[in-house]
Amino acid sequence: MNRTDELRTARIDSLVTPTELAQRYPVSSSVASHVTDSRRRIEKILNGEDPRLLVVIGPCSIHDLNAAMEYATQLQAQRQKHQARLEIVMRTYFEKPRTVVGWKGLISDPDLNGSYRVNYGLELARRLLLQVNELGVPTATEFLDMVTGQFIADLISWGAIGARTTESQIHREMASALSCPVGFKNGTDGNTRIAVDAIRASRASHMFLSPDKDGQMTIYQTSGNPYGHIIMRGGKKPNYHAEDIAAACDTLHEFDLPEHLVVDFSHGNCQKQHRRQLEVCDDICQQIRNGSTAIAGIMAESFLREGTQKIISGQPLIYGQSITDPCLNWEDTEVLLEKLAAAVDSRF
């Protein structure tokens, strides 16, 4: 009889279960309290109950745990310095969506060489999240598929659904089940309506199929996530200007949704020129000083060193520099946070 299935499967490996990984790297009571408390603070900011600004900042992607921990340690000092005005959360992205092909992130390929040791990647991701949370720094990530979140979602304070997946039904269903607030990016073309539709969908109850923590395929029924919000990330042109934010708020108002959103300084808003994040910051700071209450948060890409580098076989990587999107350096990061904190002063 002719085979009709798995004709294009080149390799199958066993995967550790979320329960097994959590037993290996358990959440302490102090970390559990930290995650719970940071989620509540973020929810209050997104609801307009707290006038402070949510700041999701960090490397475009995590590839080196030592550099990530050095960044997290320095970020914790900034958290303490600006805590009266900013709720700073570290961007800890382990999965990278690709328009065509490329390195897909630490979880998929932790060795950066196409060996795809996913079990090791999941272990590194969970270990890092525990260490960063133990420092007192909340973590943020993008949820790219329906499985890997089961391994790390208990350590995440804020989640994102990316521009390429906001329109996806399964991602909207997953967001309705997540225990943290979730931001939906506008489409890569700049369309914010799909993000509003995603917010509406994620607030509803859904049923979907997914593995549970023990790897058993399960039917999940969700109660809905009331903390979905738009991330303005630009598109063919930037959409961080006051008129863009007003237009997005009009759409939110049309559907009786909270008129609070997050502005991404990178991606389409900086037109892929990382230093323009500082220009976007200046504009957003002025909008806040002018009385904007719609801007509840911002996102920015920064690391220890400026720019980006390519992975070249046989050549060592530059420590503390991105291997995906170019980032601001640490000195610019401190300036950016100082400017944001000063602008938010006007809300008090």
From Swiss-Prot:
<keyword id="KW-0808">Transferase</keyword>
<keyword id="KW-0057">Aromatic amino acid biosynthesis</keyword>
<dbReference type="GO" id="GO:0005737">
    <property type="term" value="C:cytoplasm"/>
</dbReference>
<dbReference type="InterPro" id="IPR006218">
    <property type="entry name" value="DAHP1/KDSA"/>
</dbReference>
<protein>
    <recommendedName>
        <fullName>Phospho-2-dehydro-3-deoxyheptonate aldolase, Trp-sensitive</fullName>
        <ecNumber>2.5.1.54</ecNumber>
    </recommendedName>
</protein>
<dbReference type="GO" id="GO:0009423">
    <property type="term" value="P:chorismate biosynthetic process"/>
</dbReference>
<dbReference type="InterPro" id="IPR013785">
    <property type="entry name" value="Aldolase_TIM"/>
</dbReference>
<dbReference type="InterPro" id="IPR006219">
    <property type="entry name" value="DAHP_synth_1"/>
</dbReference>
<keyword id="KW-0028">Amino-acid biosynthesis</keyword>
<dbReference type="GO" id="GO:0008652">
    <property type="term" value="P:amino acid biosynthetic process"/>
</dbReference>
<comment type="function">
    <text>Stereospecific condensation of phosphoenolpyruvate (PEP) and D-erythrose-4-phosphate (E4P) giving rise to 3-deoxy-D-arabino-heptulosonate-7-phosphate (DAHP).</text>
</comment>
<comment type="pathway">
    <text>Metabolic intermediate biosynthesis; chorismate biosynthesis; chorismate from D-erythrose 4-phosphate and phosphoenolpyruvate: step 1/7.</text>
</comment>
<comment type="similarity">
    <text>Belongs to the class-I DAHP synthase family.</text>
</comment>
<dbReference type="GO" id="GO:0009073">
    <property type="term" value="P:aromatic amino acid family biosynthetic process"/>
</dbReference>
<dbReference type="Pfam" id="PF00793">
    <property type="entry name" value="DAHP_synth_1"/>
</dbReference>
<dbReference type="GO" id="GO:0003849">
    <property type="term" value="F:3-deoxy-7-phosphoheptulonate synthase activity"/>
</dbReference>
